[in-house]
Amino acid sequence: MIFSTLEHILTHISFSVVSIVISIHLITLFVNQIVGFYDSSKKGMIITFLCITGLLITRWFFSGHLPFSDLYESLIFLSWGFSIFYMVPRFKKQKNDLSTIIAPSVIFTQGFATSGLLTEMHQSVILVPALQSHWLMMHVSMMILGYAALLCGSLLSVAILVITFQELIPILGKSKRLSFLYESFDYAEIKYINMNERNNVLRKTSFSSYRNYYRYQFIQQLDRWGYRIISLGFIFLTIGILSGAVWANEAWGSYWNWDPKETWAFITWTIFAIYLHSRKNKKLEGLNSSIVASIGFLIIWICYFGVNLLGIGLHNYGSFTSN
């Protein structure tokens, strides 16, 4: 009872604090920097991270097994991963806009996890025999961290596409801090060049104003961080798939069975392998790689929620239909 109450308190504190953090980010989009706002959002996300960490540890001790057994626990762990990738740019003293793009992921996953749809999963249950393996921690943690990193990196690529095609919500045009995003800009000419070539390109590129230059710098920053985060997520995903294959051979006698989860995991891996390859090819880099990563954003959600929504295949543990 004590553990259940503590878990309930930590869940609602983390959700409330991250809601405040999102509000702070939205306010800073429309007004000039207010003293203390950025520090408040950073401290707020640290509190959220600590609350989610405490929630996972509490559930671990209360259930007697790692909190990776169902959709609810995996969503909590996913939001924990999002909060980590949110804080990395902040501690690197990067612009606040990167964290603003990533921050909604935390509240969406945390909100869905605590919603009434997953009420039956909130109570800890005995781990099913198929999941009672030492591979559980390696496989599931690597897969979810991979999902979190790839989703964050893909979000930055989506932001690049939105800025490039100038499809932002018109009301944001009133923001002094974001107005530079709406100036004319020949993005195709830049194509994410490296530092050695940047000066040459800048000399032949016509910027109508300093705001145009800031827009270019912002796109470069999004691309640089997106590539780093996706590269890290790809490593996590690869380790997760390989460890899952070994576990599958021990549990089912086959390394690969092509059930829905495995198939979509392979599709996800392929999409981001194409993305990383396109980054090495100057003919495909730039806008093309951002499009590939944006497609990967949708593919990950299909891979993550697909089996849980359908409740089919060998990976249907903790799905909606199984409850």
UniProtKB/Swiss-Prot annotation:
<comment type="subunit">
    <text>May interact with Ccs1.</text>
</comment>
<feature type="transmembrane region" description="Helical">
    <location>
        <begin position="98"/>
        <end position="118"/>
    </location>
</feature>
<feature type="transmembrane region" description="Helical">
    <location>
        <begin position="68"/>
        <end position="88"/>
    </location>
</feature>
<keyword id="KW-0472">Membrane</keyword>
<dbReference type="InterPro" id="IPR002541">
    <property type="entry name" value="Cyt_c_assembly"/>
</dbReference>
<dbReference type="GO" id="GO:0005886">
    <property type="term" value="C:plasma membrane"/>
</dbReference>
<dbReference type="GO" id="GO:0009535">
    <property type="term" value="C:chloroplast thylakoid membrane"/>
</dbReference>
<feature type="transmembrane region" description="Helical">
    <location>
        <begin position="291"/>
        <end position="311"/>
    </location>
</feature>
<protein>
    <recommendedName>
        <fullName>Cytochrome c biogenesis protein CcsA</fullName>
    </recommendedName>
</protein>
<comment type="similarity">
    <text>Belongs to the CcmF/CycK/Ccl1/NrfE/CcsA family.</text>
</comment>
<keyword id="KW-0812">Transmembrane</keyword>
<feature type="transmembrane region" description="Helical">
    <location>
        <begin position="229"/>
        <end position="249"/>
    </location>
</feature>
<feature type="transmembrane region" description="Helical">
    <location>
        <begin position="262"/>
        <end position="279"/>
    </location>
</feature>
<keyword id="KW-0150">Chloroplast</keyword>
<dbReference type="InterPro" id="IPR045062">
    <property type="entry name" value="Cyt_c_biogenesis_CcsA/CcmC"/>
</dbReference>
<dbReference type="GO" id="GO:0020037">
    <property type="term" value="F:heme binding"/>
</dbReference>
<keyword id="KW-0793">Thylakoid</keyword>
<keyword id="KW-0201">Cytochrome c-type biogenesis</keyword>
<dbReference type="GO" id="GO:0017004">
    <property type="term" value="P:cytochrome complex assembly"/>
</dbReference>
<dbReference type="Pfam" id="PF01578">
    <property type="entry name" value="Cytochrom_C_asm"/>
</dbReference>
<keyword id="KW-1133">Transmembrane helix</keyword>
<keyword id="KW-0934">Plastid</keyword>
<feature type="transmembrane region" description="Helical">
    <location>
        <begin position="44"/>
        <end position="64"/>
    </location>
</feature>
<dbReference type="InterPro" id="IPR017562">
    <property type="entry name" value="Cyt_c_biogenesis_CcsA"/>
</dbReference>
<feature type="transmembrane region" description="Helical">
    <location>
        <begin position="17"/>
        <end position="37"/>
    </location>
</feature>
<comment type="function">
    <text>Required during biogenesis of c-type cytochromes (cytochrome c6 and cytochrome f) at the step of heme attachment.</text>
</comment>
<feature type="transmembrane region" description="Helical">
    <location>
        <begin position="143"/>
        <end position="163"/>
    </location>
</feature>
